[in-house]
């Protein structure tokens, strides 16, 4: 985190000196009054540069598995688990099965959900402790699509994820790990402190198209949104497309020009 903040300060200096934004500055309170570009600290409220993080659920699920299997149940030693990870679980099917069966964020399970909450709070507090040129450093949990290339560079993880596979995206559960339905997902997300994600957050929610083909399904989605709002969830965005459509779009992109997928 410290290295990231130092790098951001260098970027701020470069932006200030070689990349002013006079047009944007016209619409930012304080810039006209001070006669300073927003990149040079002209804004009345200036948060500074932010950092977006990927792999929240991957981290939470991994730490939950380590705590349960190594420290609480003492089923494996830490060196044994590391050996299995280094081997990408090849020859360690039993260890991987136990890792996959450990608590997972997104199932309204405090064991994993509170780890996700704690790492978000810690990250924001730690970043706030490093000054930027004009304010403070902040972070957000909205991985956009870089959770996939990052995952390609990272080995196996204690949540049971194999080497090279995508990390989890945004505030969403790890792929395929939400087992208890949409209500459990939003209850897990509601435990996160949205005020600790000053740069923003993204919760990608996947729905099958047939779910919205009936009035009952449509009302269920409306109820889900209302419940999420009441629980204090900061953000939700929906993908409503099936795998067959996505594969067809890859093969024949010209036929699917109106297809929009949130990432």
Predicted regions and their residues:
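Acidic, glycine-enriched catalytic cores built around paired aspartates
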Residues: 1-263
């Amino acid at each position: 985190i410290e290295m990231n903040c130092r790098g951001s300060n260098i970027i701020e200096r470069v932006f200030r000196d070689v990349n002013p934004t006079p047009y944007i500055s016209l619409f930012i309170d304080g810039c006209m009054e001070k006669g300073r570009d927003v990149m040079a600290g002209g804004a009345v409220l200036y948060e500074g540069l932010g950092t977006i993080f990927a792999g929240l659920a991957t981290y939470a699920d991994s730490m939950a598995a380590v705590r349960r299997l190594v420290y609480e149940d003492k089923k494996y030693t830490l060196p044994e688990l590391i050996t299995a990870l280094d081997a990408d679980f090849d020859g360690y099917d039993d260890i991987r099965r136990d890792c996959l069966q450990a608590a997972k964020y997104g199932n309204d399970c405090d064991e994993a959900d509170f780890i996700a909450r704690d790492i978000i709070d810690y990250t924001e507090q730690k970043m706030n402790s490093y000054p930027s040129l004009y304010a403070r450093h902040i972070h957000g949990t909205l991985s956009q699509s870089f959770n996939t290339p990052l995952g390609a560079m990272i080995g196996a993880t204690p949540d049971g994820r194999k080497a090279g596979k995508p990390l989890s995206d945004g505030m969403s559960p790890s792929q395929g790990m939400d087992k208890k339905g949409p209500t459990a997902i939003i209850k897990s997300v509601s435990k996160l402190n949205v005020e600790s994600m000053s740069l923003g957050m993204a919760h990608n929610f996947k729905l099958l198209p047939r779910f919205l083909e009936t009035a009952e399904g449509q009302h269920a989605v409306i109820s889900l949104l209302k419940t999420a709002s009441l629980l204090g969830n900061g953000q939700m965005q929906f993908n409503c497309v099936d795998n067959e459509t996505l594969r067809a779009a890859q093969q024949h992109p010209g036929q699917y020009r109106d297809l929009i997928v949130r990432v």
